[in-house]
Amino acid sequence: MNHQKYIRNFSIIAHIDHGKSTLADRLIEHCGGLQAREMSQQVLDSMDIEKERGITIKAQTVRLVYKAKDGNTYYLNLMDTPGHVDFAYEVSRSLAACEGSLLVVDSTQGVAAQTLANVYQAIENDHEIVLVLNKLDLPASEPEQVKQQIEDIIGIDTSDAVLISAKSGIGIDLVLEAIVNKLPPPKESSSDILKALLVDSWYDQYLGVVILVRVIDGYLRKNMRIKMMATNSVYTVENVGYFTPKKHISDVLHAGEIGFFTAAIKQVADCKVGDTITDEKKPCEQALPGFKPNLPVVFCGLYPTDSSEFEHLKDSLAKLRLNDASFEYEMESSSALGVGFRCGFLGLLHLEIIQERLSREFDLDLITTAPSVVYKIHMQDGENLEIHNPADLPNLQKIESMEEPWIKATIMVPDEFLGAVLSLCTEKRGMQLDHSYIANRAKIIYKLPLNEIVYDFYDRLKSCSKGYASFEWQMDVYEPSELVKLGILVNAEVVDALSTIVHRSRAEQRGRALCVRLKDLIPRQQIDIAIQASIGSRIIARETIKALRKDVLSKCYGGDISRKRKLLEKQKAGKKRMRQYGNIEIPQSAFIAALKIGDE
């Protein structure tokens, strides 16, 4: 099939819950990609977590064969992309492999902040955009108002928007005709030499690493010797094919097509996403521009509740890493929690997804330490450090200055919830940069410290706006800040797993809250237990768990007072000895509850 004019490569852009995976299901159904009995909801969301949470995490691809009204048969390559801010990187990869996009907007809710970010990315990639207004069958649907909103915010023409209901299947044929007539075919191949973009890779236990590619020039066929231009690795192609969404093996992938190949590659880490794949014998001269590397911004420790599970955790993380190159980890040990791993994530949702996959797919019971971000430390001796583990923070006396990362956040919220959202941003040390109105929705741009966002910002934003606010952010700058290390001591012993780096203005409040929480969680012992929060050597908050007291006088019926005094003195001496040598066991449940994300 070398008719590039009959190929359409497109991605679907939409905010969470605006219906993109449902639309993808209807397109697959309409084009006969699966029989009716094989259809399930959200066909392209392959992970159970994706289906349950109703979100797309990994970008998926499918080739559809469509007989258009003009009598020609078209080959449509659909990339279903994630909508959540943590997975924006998956979106950028999908967009780079396509020429056009379907912008799906919920006609009952209008434009959301994350949609904006993805649309601007699509425009940067020179995409032709087809507007699709979904959920037309709902009583709250306001297509004309939403069209006006899109013209005001994004500035694209909405006169030929396609109105559909993906759930009931209304207007699906109109979407397919719009894809064929409005989206451009791939550019003509300028050379016969293979040049392909590595879009994604994942691990298959039978085939090894499966690589998703978009062929730009030339062709990719079985038994070909190929070279990865970033790593200079050479492999022999074993299988070539595409998804419909079932796996189909074919002989060759031509220019303009999206498909997969396998080549006995052992690790996903060997395949750099955005790399250029070329023929080993006749390599292309210039590599494709690729993507900017995806760096983790949120870090936390993962520890097994049972230390014998450590090897199992190590193997499980290695397997997850095979499918998720954006996830990083390294070994670390804690005096309170034993040996575990320090892990880096793209954001809090990414952290939750990894945690959930570890417990579900690998049956692991884990303790997660408080999330932290990367701080830049300037030492007095001129040395510069980057730290994401509070335990690694040097002595404050030796530090010249500390910088924390700030983000630029775009929040879109209905007018009636604006006050609550503004006060939340102010409480989180935010600085307002811009404030505008589009119809009855406010669009505010804030500069916020990432440290404040990783705790509970997203949950609180959703609750104070009854779920209507949408939030999108990107890293902005590092700025000097008055940061301190908040330590927690139990019976004068530092519990390193509970240490956090906080802004000085929030230290006392955070310390007091942690002490109160631990007081409720640690069971009473036979001695008083002091729980303290400290900054350096200064104690800023304290709670005391009162001792349990055994009634040593229960068997003394009357009799001499000196007998009672002797028993009480003996008890007192025993408690003194316990205070001196006794270790306070903090139960795992107390750790888990104390480290719950959320700053009460």
UniProtKB/Swiss-Prot annotation:
CDD domains: EF4_II, EF4_III, LepA, lepA_C. One of its GO terms (biological process) is positive regulation of translation. It is a peripheral membrane protein. It is found in: Cell inner membrane. It comes from the Bacteria. NCBIfam families: lepA, small_GTP. This is Elongation factor 4. It comes from Rickettsia africae (strain ESF-5). The gene is lepA.
